[in-house]
Amino acid sequence: MHISSLPGKYGIGTFGRSAYEFCDFLEKAGQKYWQILPLGQTSYGDSPYQSFSAFAGNPYFIDLDILNEKNLLDKDDYEEKNFGDNKEMINYGLIFNEKMKVLRKAYMNFNSKDDESFAKFIEDEKKWLDDYSLFMALKYKFNFISWNSWNKDIKLRKNEEIEKYKDELKEDVNYWKFLQYEFFSQWKNLKDYANKKNIKIIGDIPIYIAQDSSDVWSNPDIFLLNKETLEPLKVSGCPPDAFSETGQLWGNPIYDWGYLEKTNFEWWVDRIKSSLKLYDILRIDHFRGFEAYWSVDYGEKTAQNGKWIKGPEMKLFNVIKEKIGDIEIIAEDLGYLTEETLEFKKRTGFPGMKIIQFAFGGDSSNPYLPHNYEKNCVAYTGTHDNDTVRGWFEVTGSKEEKEKAVEYFKLTEEEGYNWGVIRGVWSSVANTSIGVMQDFLNLGNEARINKPSTLASNWSWRAKDNVFTNELANKIYRLTRIYGRCE
């Protein structure tokens, strides 16, 4: 469950009391992992997979009550603000309009000159923080237009122009640094609390970066861009398949892996190091893109005319191991996989993913059926891109697939189809099993987080107050203990 989906008073889940209470709930339920979506600052469309920075955190998650405890805000500054009337859905427009004003007030009450920890944070994170903070100050100054539409000198980062805006926007730049300081401070305290309860945080890293991001603006050489306009030459996507005749056109700029290799993959090493400050375990999205990626000419309307290009494969991960050491990674290996992709994943040793909803098409050799699992995998009841179990049974699953699922897991209405599927995942040989919180709560597709290739209402679901009960925790604990997953 993502941070944004936590219950609470101020429109969106935060690093506040509800997050700590959720850690308590997970401990009572005998759970060892809390998997979340990317924590990056969201942009248009509110997707955590399209953020303004691969390094910065989302200011929306900063808890206002904690700022009050630090004497940076009075309760009157935020308690009566309109963050949205529906506690089960995030209104991102209101959060953007109201919460950012409140956070600005907190900054105005913050004495950065006398705060040694703030100065240390700025120095420690200087490599990305300076560019990001200037980027965000410029985004606000230029009414959020894409940096590709800024005037040429600042778009191309001419030194005189950079220095001019650093001076002109000095206070705004410092404000964005303050927000990152608060984000990382509050998150560290929450993560430490979870870790003391023997709960590891599984974080999510998108393989690609948004074109309209501080990373592309400040590091154009690591992407395949037109040297004059800095627009992409190639963009990301995936090829046509049984689900889409034209494929999926994601539109992110493609890495210049040749250039990155010459730098010993410095940017990627920095990114992994930074991510390990946030998470204990990293799930890397679209992992197959490191073996080979689908490259589409910029300007194409669909992905169907793209082609496969070889990726860095083990060269990248050998450098990461050399520079950082052994780290825990989950390879998101869903979708179109070739023998080369499977062999590459095997060489990394990283566990892949098994999604139970994919199990009931085809015959008994379907790799997503639990009897075909290998131990070195992570089994899921679903992900942010799937229906809930209840939604699958009620709406989207085919009659044949649902009949197979009922027979395979011996599902009954008395037990509850959701609990029967969870039981099936928990009882598998997978080293790790993870359930979507909506499935434990037996919610339908109204609680689905994301429907790919659509825009409306994605990333908006929030849990109701008081749903993480002792009764539910005990039920999850009993199931977890039966299958030896508490040890």
Curated annotation (Swiss-Prot):
Reaction equation(s) it catalyzes: Transfers a segment of a (1->4)-alpha-D-glucan to a new position in an acceptor, which may be glucose or a (1->4)-alpha-D-glucan
Q: Which domain of life is it from?
A: Bacteria
Q: Which UniProt keywords apply?
A: Carbohydrate metabolism, Cytoplasm, Glycosyltransferase, Transferase
The EC number(s) attached to this protein equal: 2.4.1.25
Is the Glycosyltransferase keyword given for this protein?
yes
- Main site of residence? cytoplasm
Looking up InterPro entries in the UniProt record yields: Glyco_hydro_77, Glycoside_hydrolase_SF
GO CC terms, sorted:
cytoplasm
What are its GO biological-process terms? carbohydrate metabolic process
Which Gene3D superfamilies does the protein's record reference? Glycosidases (3.20.20.80)
Respond yes or no to whether keyword Transferase is given for this record. Answer: yes
Record's Pfam families? Glyco_hydro_77 (PF02446)
Which residue pairs form cystines in this protein?
Answer: none
User: According to its UniProt record, where is this protein located?
Assistant: Cytoplasm
The Gene Ontology terms for molecular function here are: 4-alpha-glucanotransferase activity; glycosyltransferase activity
Per the entry, what this protein does is: Catalyzes a disproportionation reaction in which single or multiple glucose units from oligosaccharides are transferred to the 4-hydroxyl group of acceptor sugars. Glucose, maltose and maltotriose can act as acceptor, whereas of the three only maltotriose can act as donor.
Instruction: Report the PANTHER family cross-referenced here.
Output: 4-ALPHA-GLUCANOTRANSFERASE DPE1, CHLOROPLASTIC/AMYLOPLASTIC (PTHR32438), 4-ALPHA-GLUCANOTRANSFERASE DPE1, CHLOROPLASTIC_AMYLOPLASTIC (PTHR32438:SF5)
What family is this protein classified in?
Belongs to the disproportionating enzyme family.
Q: What is this protein called?
A: 4-alpha-glucanotransferase
Q: Organism classification, top ranks?
A: Bacteria, Bacillati, Bacillota, Clostridia, Eubacteriales
